[in-house]
Amino acid sequence: MMLIRIIIMLLIALFVESRQEAFGQTTDTLSLSDKVIRTASFATGFRGEIWQNPALYYYYTPYIWTRLDVNGAYHDKGKASLKQEGDKDTRIGVDVNSFVILSERDRVFGSAGYRSEKQENVLWNENIDWKLIAPYVTGDSIGGFLKGETYYFNGGYASESGSWTWGITGGYRAFHNYRDKDPRPRNTASDLSFALGAGYRLGTYRLGVSVDFRLYQQKSEISFLADKGSTSVYHMLGLGMDYVRFAGNQTGTKHQGIRWGGSIGILPVDTEKGISATVSIDRMSMDKKLSNANNLTLLELNTTDLKGNVTWMRELQQAEHLAVKLDAGYIVRKGMENIYGEAGGSSYGALISTSPGMKVTNSRIAVSGLWEKLLTDKGVWGGAIVPNIIYHRLETDYNAVSRFVHLSVLESSLRARLLYQKRLLRLTAEANGGYYANLSAEYSLPGLNTAKSSAQTLLANIDYLSDSYSMVGIRLQGDYPIMKQYNL
């Protein structure tokens, strides 16, 4: 079945390529080899968040391209992992991305993909999309592996008329995972999103604004087939706490969320030089319901995400760039727990009050640099250097039980790329390394029973996040044109 899905994605890529020939009206004089080099360039996407505006994405590249990636990875994280995400994962997938110039005024762009994944040794989390719904997952003391599949489709259209540009994008992601061994979670998630943007030229810059919308839903059910019966499941509240009243056999849950957001930014008309800047804010409201208890709303999670970046880029000479980027972000996640009265008959009791739940704030500031020289017809060597430094301040507070975990972290990384070409063959060697340094770690967990599995998981996560460690990696790639329109 997985092979069939990959073949389908290959056919989609070939179809997109054929449509480019049919509908692309403008003259695209860039050679295939130059397109391959430029789409893989760090400079192309270095400005980052500004390209989320579908109107400004009109100017992402001045040429037509389609890229197909068949990829696979195995990652053994060992102790350097959150227990709720597992310590090993195996992935295989295929991704198609395309940008088509229909005419001098019109652009269409999109992506599609499929991914098969297996996570191992997942503890105290029987849901998917951990980063989105954490800490409000359903968990148990057994856990195990999780197998899953993801499908996604995104498409957009942008048009220019005089000084104005407008664009629209839409996307859908479907994800499911399961375990065919007790306990047997079966999760399905749907993620629908839209964005609308507009841009206006002011001299040598373009001013852009955008709004976006997201609708998310996850349905989960845990079953048991073993003769010895079921294991108790718990609805986690964070920092080792769970909703005691509904612990036991409430195995069906539903997460539903809506997000609204917007951004404003500026982009230079010549995207290869000058300053760009953007500020965005998103707010998402999500609730968790017990589907086997008359869809009783157990709790709510409200997330506010404020981001901004400023990028300066300069073209030193043809195909050589220098750039610096400053990123900052502030995320606040606030939980609200619903308290219900005594149950009676088929009722689980009336809502009598609410109580503030766990609050998480994540402050981040990052500085990145870039020097890159692309391959050209006149040279056989190229390369790039991308240094990056990030400061994080993560504060998790659960005031109702006087528990907290506060962490400060400094991350540094360096990516280096070397390019070489010999006639039609192009070789890429890339090395990256980083260091995660804990600056401070404070926590207080009164009343925590360290004999419990959930408490041991919490303490293991704190040990991981408050530790310091390094990482290294290498990548080798070869490119060779196999036909006039295709590069392998």
Where are these regions (language model features)?
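Outer-membrane beta-barrel proteins
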Residues: 77-93, 142-146, 175-189, 251-255, ...
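Outer-membrane beta-barrel translocator/channel fold
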Residues: 114-151, 210, 217-222, 245-247
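Bacterial Sec-dependent N-terminal signal peptides
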Residues: 1-31
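Outer membrane beta-barrel transmembrane domains
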Residues: 129-138, 235-488
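Transmembrane beta-barrel strand/turn architecture of Gram-negative outer membrane proteins
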Residues: 90-107, 111, 189-212, 303-325, ...
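Surface-exposed extracellular loop regions of Gram-negative outer-membrane beta-barrel proteins
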Residues: 156-181, 189-192, 278-291, 384-390
